[in-house]
From Swiss-Prot:
The keyword Cell wall biogenesis/degradation does not apply. Its EC number is 3.4.21.-. The active site is at D173, H214, S388. Residues 463-603 form the P/Homo B domain. GO terms for cellular component: extracellular space; Golgi medial cisterna; Golgi membrane; perikaryon; proximal dendrite; trans-Golgi network. The chain crosses the membrane at residues 1701-1721. Residues 136-455 form the Peptidase S8 domain. This is Proprotein convertase subtilisin/kexin type 5.
């Protein structure tokens, strides 16, 4: 690198020290990235140019002029300020900022800007010496001479007459060589200037390295002159080209602003191929002036149409840079262009980001072709590269489009690019189709630009609607970004729908403003997901970005949501992936973020905008499904997605038929696609159908057919649905985006092993749920087991598992002992109610209590003195007395001791701790230190730091430490060691277990074998093996010589049953099976005839007996086959000319080469003689041949006498009664390949005879065992015992509780801790409050705690409009309070309005004229105090009924004092009053309806409540006057029996005729889901779905099913007799009109005057005098005239007669209503029925039965409608006329019309009137 100023500094004559300092500064400055200030200022001055001149002159500045097109912004220069300085300028000139007219001033800072080509020295480059037009490969893709697969169709635009004429493009760079022969003709001086040199000449500075070639190269791509025989051709070769020289000097904000705003009314397009450093660590963008210049340009440039800014996306690919950190390409005002190589692959330098709009060609690897263009010194180059080459190419294409339509706005240009760019052959793994149908990628934006398509679109373009900008509210909720995790924030955007000037409905750009603090910015990745599910990567990890600055209000931008709807949930995700370079542990924080939505409020593409794309010169489809191609312009091939049937035009919507799939748009356009886009699934008829709204992928359109979910939703794998909140028993697995199941016993959890709440009957032990066992038991993992006999409570088996001890035992160091050991004392302070033994002080041998002052005896050599052990007088500390009485030194580890060894210590030095007589430096791992002593850890811990199970620091073998709770939890079964992160990932296995892929197995899994306690994988395609050989192969492969092959060797065939290669018959060369007639080729000399190898003369010798006398050998068939085959080949060849040949030596007689009989001792098998029958055959003595065993049999002793079945993993067969079956029949189970009998009472079983799967008869299944009844808290559902719901005491269904456990309450069939709002608890049930109450103590209107209507007030439980007299309203709680006793009317507790007699109002208080004693009252007549009656304590007059209060032992009843309250009152001992009972109570214990002790006549008592009608689940017992419980199967009932039900609970159905509730309706009935009843099928139906005649699913005898109707097989009055086709018809019983069989109990229809009794199919008369009710052989026609209902029994009749008059009246009213209904019905019959658009179906072949009911008397229309998302609705409307003729109305046309589903759409739902 040439440092320039450094070399100038060190010229001869300079001081050496100065040179050194200058060079040092030059080296350090780039490293430190210090700001470099210039002597140029940008100033905003109001008042015009003259005022700016005046102020500049006043402070020593030179006013260079206005900054570009920025009004009131001026460029000031100060010659006396250092040209470059690391310090901002100070001096008198800085006082300019105090001038009133100076609104803003900024000293300019040098900005690092990099040209976006790449250094050719990095890669070997290829030079071409003759750069001519034919070599410009990127313009010739369509001529088949270049390998590029997709054309930018530039020639197509030229052929339409567009070459860029009158369009002005300027290149913002290091200047352009305006004198270049290829540029001078198109050079435009008005579009050119030199910002660096402050003049108008853009000529570059020349030097030896040609450093400033960049701008000239870019200019040639755009507008190099055509046909001048010099060098190359520009894309817009008639456009005007200019240049702004601005990169060859200090680049400041002012320099950039001047450049991008230069002559904006003349320049149309600005092209820039530079930006901040692409080093993977810079975050930089335009400063304030440049941002202002961009905004002014799009607002006012091109006379209000807006300047077009084209920008190269960046070359930081090698540095893992991300162009989202470049504020120029990240701007909505710039068109960011990326590059692709000739092959369509990603170039190595390419950055990816969500702001890239489109792509053009450039170079790729060093060996790839590069771009040909103009170069400095009037030369050409074929080495132009990088995204620098792509941006000018795009500028040239845009120039062609602007020539086609000069009125395109800056936004129109972007829309045209979006709609015409295409993916083509561009290679990226992130292509996706957004919800608007646009295909988009982070590498290439919307794809390769298409010049011809753009000019065609521009020709007919209509300006898009006005841009709206919606700034959504900022989310300032601070969220911590933890390492290796993600932060997710969801914002519900409205698109500013409440503000019409800012409402954004259809999106263009989306900007996300983010503030994040973070210790290493490069570790962050940020994603944004739109409401439609499109996910944009706003930022990727950057390896070299070590900055700790984070992002402060940085704007990320995405175009991936273009065309989508704005409103909905936007999901921001921030991921932190810590790199190894990160040293700081402080987590990052998402401080705030907000959305800025740009777009339109209305659809931007009106019908006039739906212009055709051109395909004339390209051969790959334009991937924009929203376009409408014009057939009149079509002249090319069909779209690749059309099938060979053909097309009507070039587009994917012109196909006659699709090759792969299609989907429809709301404009009825069908688009052909290679695969269904995200959010769709492959349906029938090649149709792509929409998934449910929350599904990302699916297998059907319903909400329960999802395969994966959109962001913000999680897949519930059990229901295949996407949910925002995972259901109970599962947790949100953010990594997999699914609802992960909690472990078996968890109710709620945060991970599989982290329970937060347990199911009923279990308790949380750390993070695991265990069964709550009774005291004296522990949970073993399966059930509760008894503790050791010493333990009162325990955590595990054995004496070591005790927590507390039984009576007579005490706890000592984790064990239960009968008495304390030596050196322990009994601690009487109870811990949890239990005593324990504590260790004595070290100095004591025995003791009575804690500390050194409670010793009771001392070690040898110590004397007991006042409870303390003192050293004997003769020895010192550190010594002990030996047996001779001499002092000896203790072991060095002891401070005091009683013996010589290290185990004899009694106290320790300060550096050691005491451990069972030893002084150690540290406690062993299984103990912890407390008060300088070692204590044992909890028995579950291997190491610990405290006594409890949660203080473990290390765990035993086979356990791991739970990171959240610190407890030791068991590893996966078989693991000796496992990791905390994954307890299933074993580090070693227990004895008897095999290790395979970090898991321990008792037996090695499939396709592995065990070797040295490891499972090793079998060979390729092997299904089972050992270390020596493979035993069988995967499906499609055959075992051959120990390995698995797809094709067997010649002479062998693949046996599908055995999975092995077996030898062919010896007569075959190759074959397809074992038989002689399964040859596929023959040995030489024989010919193939229908699978058999025969002599050519076979017809002449067939049947001849050959050479019977030849002696027989005893060959081995399998062994001899290869040798025999070789012998035969020689023999056949040798004797081919002979007419007759001898049989094979093994045959007795033969036909050709095939034996037909065998000598004695051998047997015929497959036309060969064998010494014994092979496996799979049996010897037939009758035929002396081997017969094949039955199919699937491996060995047998005869036909149907199988002894062993074939068995393969994919096809296991089981032996049962001499035959082989795929599964055992009912009552048998598989054991060792044989079906064995299940043990009674098992109906079916599995695994062993007693492991039942279903039970016989009335037995029920519970955990694999059949019982007569289910255990407590279980219920039988379809023969299986199901556990009642949680907290349930008794239930009738696994989801329907009938009685709760204590302290729980029944609500909606489940048990709850408390009742919901507006319910009160009573008898373990939640009972609804009265409608007036908001909360209550009972069901009545005077049981309220608060009022539902806020305008009401509460008084004594009643909600009233106003407080009654003698009370006032308490405004705090809206209750009525009693006035003071002297007040008659008051407005508050302190304000009386009127007083009782004898009192007057004085200052709002009622006072007596004179203060009387407590037992006196003021007598108005005598004007003095008089005594109260003796029964009163206080009073208002002399009589006994004028009391206010009463003496003790008496109670105030109204105004009288009584000793006992009468019936209907209860005694309130606090107020000494008799308070009325509730109106429903006869006697009570309180005022509420729930405090009754007995009830009034006519009321029923339920607990302490009196009811006129018993609540659900109870019936009124009139004898006792109580509500008694119904049978638990009933919801309501009339008695205690299961046959007294009147309605049923959920999941049950009422059979009214029997009064029973059934889980499933009996035969001949169907379940009416709405009424929850079992209703009788039509008499002809055996099974049905409804009561109508056409709802049959199957028929009774003598009828057959025809379109849901059971049609008789005989004429009316006869029934079928006999099976098969030859049957007779016999007459029905005389009482039947139609029947299903003989006798009077098989009627299906009745003659006139008779009614059908459904239950026994009899036809009976109505009951009358001759048929009294008692006969049971007549119908109660008063109840029904449609069917026969038998009269009630005498007892029932008597019971009915006791009913109240209310029921009689109700019945009369019902009859009147029925009569009125009949009249209305009769009238309706006379009205005409509209029959438009109905077609009559074919005449039925048989007549309907004479059974008719009212539902057939009217025309019926039945409409089926599928309300789910987008399903085909092809059901027709069925219509039945009065004559029984069936019609069908078709929803989509006439009966004979072809299927047409044109009314179906995938993007919206429509309803039709």
């Amino acid at each position: 690198m040439d440092w320039g100023w450094g070399s100038r500094c060190c010229r001869p004559g300079r001081r050496d020290l100065l040179c050194v300092l200058a060079l040092l500064a030059g080296c350090l400055l780039p490293v430190c990235r210090t700001r470099v200030y210039t002597n140029h200022w940008a100033v905003k001055i109001a008042g015009g140019f003259a005022e700016a001149d005046r102020i500049a002159s006043k402070y020593g500045f030179i006013n260079v002029g206005q900054i570009g097109a920025l009004k009131d912004y001026y460029h000031f220069y100060h010659s006396r300020t250092i040209k470059r300085s690391v310090l901002s300028s100070r001096g008198t000139h800085s006082f300019i900022s105090m001038e009133p007219k100076v609104e803003w001033i900024q000293q300019q800072v040098v900005k690092k800007r990099t040209k976006r080509d790449y250094d050719l020295s990095r890669a070997q480059s290829t030079y071409f010496n003759d750069p001519k037009w034919p070599s410009m490969w990127y313009m010739h893709c369509s001529d088949n001479t270049h390998p590029c697969q997709s054309d930018m169709n530039i020639e197509g635009a030229w052929k339409r007459g567009y070459t860029g004429k009158n369009i002005v493009v300027t290149i913002l760079d290091d200047g352009i060589e305006r004198t270049h022969p290829d540029l001078m003709q198109n050079y435009d001086a008005l579009a050119s200037c030199d910002v660096n040199g402050n003049d108008l000449d853009p000529m570059p500075r020349y030097d030896a390295s040609n450093e400033n070639k960049h701008g000239t190269r870019c200019a040639g791509e755009v507008a190099a002159t055509a046909n001048n025989s010099h060098c190359t051709v520009g894309i817009a070769f008639n456009a005007k080209i200019g240049g702004v020289r601005m990169l060859d000097g200090d680049v400041t904000d002012m320099v950039e602003a001047k450049s991008v705003s230069y002559n904006p009314q003349h320049v149309h397009i600005y092209s820039a191929s530079w930006g901040p450093d692409d080093d993977g660590k810079t975050v930089d963008g335009p400063a304030p002036l440049t941002r202002q210049a961009f905004e002014n340009g799009v607002r006012m440039g091109r006379r209000g149409l807006g300047s077009v800014f084209v920008w190269a996306s960046g070359n930081g690919g090698r540095s893992k840079d991300h162009c989202s950190c470049d504020g120029y390409t990240n701007s909505i005002y710039t068109i960011s262009i990326s590059s692709t190589a000739e092959s369509g692959k990603k170039p190595w330098y390419l950055e990816e980001c969500s702001s890239t709009l489109a792509t053009t060609y450039s170079s790729g690897e060093s060996y790839d072709k590069k771009i040909i263009t103009t170069d400095l010194r009037q030369r050409c180059t074929d080495n132009h590269t990088g995204t620098s080459a792509s941006a000018p190419m795009a500028a040239g294409i845009i120039a062609l489009a602007l020539e086609a339509n000069p009125f395109l706005t800056w936004r129109d240009v972007q829309h045209v690019i979006v709609r015409t760019s295409r993916a083509g052959h561009l290679n990226a793994n992130d292509w996706k189709t957004n919800a608007a149908g646009f295909k988009v990628s982070h590498l290439y934006g919307f794809g390769l630009m298409d010049a011809e398509a753009m000019v065609m679109e521009a020709e007919k373009w209509t300006t898009v609607p006005q841009q709206h900008v919606c700034v959504e509210s900022t989310d300032r909720q601070i969220k911590t970004i933890r390492p290796n995790s993600a932060v997710r924030s969801i914002y519900k955007a409205s698109g500013c729908s409440d503000n019409p000037n800012h409402h954004v409905n259809y999106l263009e750009h989306v900007v996300v403003r983010i503030t994040i603090t973070h210790p290493r910015r490069g570790d962050l990745a940020i994603y944004l997901t739109s409401p439609s599910g499109t996910r944009s990567q706003l930022l990727a990890n950057r390896l070299f970005d070590h900055s700790m600055e984070g992002f402060k209000n940085w704007e990320f931008m995405t175009i991936h949501c273009w065309g989508e709807r704005a409103a909905g949930d936007w999901v921001l995700e921030v991921y932190d992936t810590p790199s190894q370079l990160r040293n700081f542990k402080t987590p990052g924080k998402l401080k705030e973020w907000s959305l800025v939505l740009y777009g339109t409020s209305v659809q931007p593409y009106s019908p006039t905008n739906e212009f055709p794309k051109v395909e004339r010169f390209r051969y790959s489809r334009v991937e924009d499904p929203t376009d409408d191609y014009g057939a009149e312009d079509y002249a090319g091939p069909c779209d690749p997605e059309c099938s060979e049937v053909g097309c009507d035009g070039p587009g994917p919507d012109h196909c006659t038929d699709c090759l792969h799939y299609h989907y429809k748009l709301k404009n009825n356009t069908r688009i052909c696609v290679s695969s269904c886009p995200p959010g769709h699934f492959h349906a029938d008829k090649k149709r792509c159908r929409k998934c449910a709204p929350n599904c990302e992928s699916c297998f059907g359109s319903h909400a329960d057919q999802c395969l994966s979910c959109k962001y913000g939703y999680f897949l519930n794998e059990e229901t295949s649905s996407c949910v925002a909140q995972c259901p109970e028993g599962s947790y949100q697995d953010i990594k997999k985006n699914i609802c992960g199941k909690c472990s078996e016993n968890c109710k709620t959890c945060t991970g599989f092993h982290n329970c937060t709440e347990c199911k009923g009957g279990l308790s949380l032990q750390g993070s695991r749920c265990s069964v709550t066992c009774e005291d004296g038991q522990f949970f073993s993992g399966h059930d509760c087991q008894p503790c050791h006999r010493f333990c009162a409570t325990c955590a595990g088996a054995g004496a070591d598992g005790c927590i507390n001890c039984t009576e007579g035992y005490v706890m000592e160091e984790g064990r239960c002992v009968q008495s304390c050991s030596v050196s322990y004392y009994l601690d009487h302070s109870l811990e949890g109610g239990y005593k324990s033994c504590k260790r004595c002080d070290n100095s004591c041998l025995t003791c009575n209590g804690p500390g050194f002052k409670n010793c009771s005896s001392c070690p040898s050599g110590y004397l007991l003195d006042l409870g303390m052990c003192q050293m004997g007088a003769i020895c010192k500390d550190g010594e002990y007395i030996d047996e001779q009485g001499h002092c000896q030194i203790c072991d060095a580890s002891c401070a005091k001791c009683w013996g010589p060894t290290q185990d004899d210590c009694i106290s320790c030095p300060i550096t050691r701790v005491f451990d069972d007589g030893r002084c150690v430096m540290n406690c062993p791992s299984w103990k912890f230190e407390l008060k300088k002593q070692c204590h044992p850890c909890h028995h579950t811990c291997q190491g610990c730091q405290g006594s409890g199970p949660s203080n473990c620091t290390s765990c035993k073998a086979g356990e791991f430490q739970d990171s959240e709770y610190g407890e030791c939890m068991p590893c996966e079964e078989g693991c000796v060691g496992c990791t905390v992160d994954d307890p299933g990932a074993c580090t070693s296995c227990a004895t008897g277990y095999y290790m395979f892929e970090r898991h321990c197995y008792k037996a090695c899994p499939e396709k592995t074998f065990g070797e040295k306690w490891e499972c090793k994988a079998c060979g390729t395609n092997c299904g089972s093996c050992d270390q020596h050989e493979c035993y069988w192969c995967e499906e499609g492969f055959f075992l051959s010589s120990g390995s698995c092959v797809q094709d067997c060797d010649p002479g062998f065939y693949g046996d599908q049953e055995l999975g092995e290669c077996k030898p062919c018959h010896r007569a075959c060369e190759t074959c397809t099976g074992l038989g002689y007639n399964q040859c596929s080729s023959c040995p030489e000399g024989l010919q193939l005839w229908h699978g058999t190898c025969i002599w050519p003369t076979w017809p002449h010798v067939e049947g001849k007996v050959w050479n019977e006398a030849v002696p027989t050998e005893k060959p081995s068939l399998v062994r001899s086959l290869p040798q025999d085959r070789r012998k035969w080949k020689v023999q056949i060849k040798r004797d081919a000319t002979r007419q007759y040949q001898p049989c094979h030596s093994s045959c007795k007689t033969c036909n050709g080469s095939l034996c037909t009989s065998c000598p004695a001792g051998t047997y015929l098998w497959l036309q060969a003689c064998v010494p014994s029958c092979p496996q799979g055959t049996w010897l037939s003595v009758r035929s002396s041949s081997c017969e094949k065993c039955a199919e699937g049999c491996a060995s047998c002793s005869g036909d149907d006498l199988c002894q062993r079945c074939l068995s393969q993993p994919s096809n296991t067969l089981l032996l049962h009664e001499g035959r082989c079956y795929h599964s055992c029949p009912e009552g048998f189970y598989a054991k060792d390949g044989v079906c064995e009998h299940c043990s009674s009472p098992c109906k079916t079983c599995k695994g062993n005879a007693t492991s039942c799967h279903s039970c016989e008869g009335d037995f029920v299944l519970d955990h694999g065992v059949c019982w007569e009844t289910c255990p407590e808290k279980h219920v039988a559902v379809e023969g299986v015992c199901k556990h009642c719901p949680e907290r349930c005491q008794d239930c009738i269904h696994e989801k329907t509780c009938k009685e709760c456990m204590p302290d729980f309450f029944l609500y909606n069939d489940m048990c709850h801790h408390s009742c919901p709002k507006n319910f009160y608890p009573d008898m373990r049930q939640c009972v609804p409050c009265h409608k007036n109450c908001l909360g209550c103590n009972g069901p009545k209107e005077d049981d309220c705690k608060a009022c539902a209507d806020t305008s009401k007030v509460l008084h004594n439980g009643l909600c009233l409009d106003e407080c009654p007299k003698g009370t006032y309203k308490d405004e705090v709680n809206d209750e009525c309070r009693d006035c003071p006793e002297s007040c008659l009317i008051c407005s508050s507790a302190w304000t009386c309005l009127t007083c009782r007699e004898g009192f007057t109002v004085v200052q709002d208080v009622c006072t007596a004229p004179k203060e009387c004693a407590a037992i006196e009252y003021w007598d108005v007549g005598s004007h003095r105090c008089q005594p109260c009656h003796r029964k009163c304590s206080r009073c208002s007059g002399p009589s006994e009924n004028q009391c206010y209060t009463c003496p003790r032992e008496t109670f105030l009843l109204n105004t009288t004092c009584v000793k006992e309250c009468p019936e209907g009152y209860h005694t309130d001992k606090d107020s000494h009053q008799c308070v009325p009972c509730h109106s429903s109570c006869r006697t009570c214990e309180g005022p509420h309806s729930m405090q009754c002790l007995s009830c009034r006549p006519g009321w029923f008592q339920l607990g302490k409540e009196c009811l006129l009608q018993c609540r659900d689940g109870y019936y009124g017992e009139s004898t006792s006057g109580r509500c008694e419980k119904c049978d638990k199967s009933c919801k309501t009932c009339r008695g205690p029996q299961p046959t007294d039900c009147q309605s049923c609970d959920t999941f049950f159905f009422l059979l009214r005729s029997k009064g029973q509730c059934h889980l499933a309706c009996p035969e001949h009935y169907y379940a009416d889901q709405h009424a929850q009843t079992c209703e009788r099928c039509h008499p002809t139906c055996d099974k049905c779905s409804g009561k109508e005649a056409w709802n049959c699913l199957s028929c009774v005898w003598s009828y057959h099913l025809l379109k849901g109707i059971c049609t008789p097989e005989c004429i009316v009055g006869e029934y079928r007799d006999g099976k098969g086709e030859n049957f007779n018809c016999k007459k029905c019983h005389e009482s039947c009109m139609e029947c299903k069989g003989p006798g009077s109990k098989n009627c299906t229809g009745c003659s006139a005057g008779l009614l059908l009794q459904m239950d026994d199919s009899r036809c009976l008369r109505c009951c009358n005098a001759s048929h009294p009710h008692r006969s049971q052989d007549c119908c109660d026609c008063q109840s029904s005239t449609d069917e026969c209902i038998l009269p009630a029994s005498d007892d029932t009749v008597f019971h009915e007669h006791t009913k109240t008059a209310l029921l009689v009246t109700s019945g009369a009213m019902l009859l009147l209503l029925l009569g009125a209904a009949v009249v209305v019905w009769r009238k309706s019959r006379s009205q005409p029925v509209a029959k438009g658009r109905y077609e009559k179906l074919a005449e039925p072949t048989v007549s309907y039965s004479s059974y008719r009911s009212s539902y057939l008397d009217e025309d019926q229309v039945i409409e089926y409608r599928d309300r789910d998302y987008d399903e085909d609705d092809e059901d027709d409307i069925v219509y039945m006329g009065q004559d029984g003729t069936v019609y069908r109305k078709f929803k989509y046309g006439l009966l004979d019309e072809a299927e047409d589903d044109e009314l179906e759409y995938d993007d919206e739902s429509y309803s039709y009137q």
